[in-house]
Amino acid sequence: PLVSATTAISHELGRPLNGLLVRKEAKDHGTGQFVEGLGNFKPGDKVAMLEDVVTTGGSLLKACDRVRAAGLDIVAVCCILDREEGGREKLKEAGYELHSLFTRKELVEMARS
């Protein structure tokens, strides 16, 4: 939903962005690909990874691996919520800086105020 909304809004604003969907499991129907939407990109294109919630970072790292294996250059890794359960550190070890809109601590503090 995040990627679909982002690409739709970008087109409405006249600054179109293409999007990819990275699956946890390849489907046994359709294209059967882990990464959908590659036809909109060429090798070496720069992409940003967008995730709703990062916990340990494992799923996001796997998605990054699949996108890089497809020949794309990841220039940003972003999420809405970093649950602060090791994901940021794990991503940093892999060479990615995580940009989050909120951390768990920030949301808890806002809820208490």
Where are these regions (language model features)?
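Short, glycine/charge-rich flexible loops or terminal/linker lids adjacent to PRPP-binding catalytic cores
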Residues: V3-A48, G58-L61
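Ordered, amphipathic secondary-structure segments that act as subunit-interaction surfaces
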Residues: P1-S4, M110
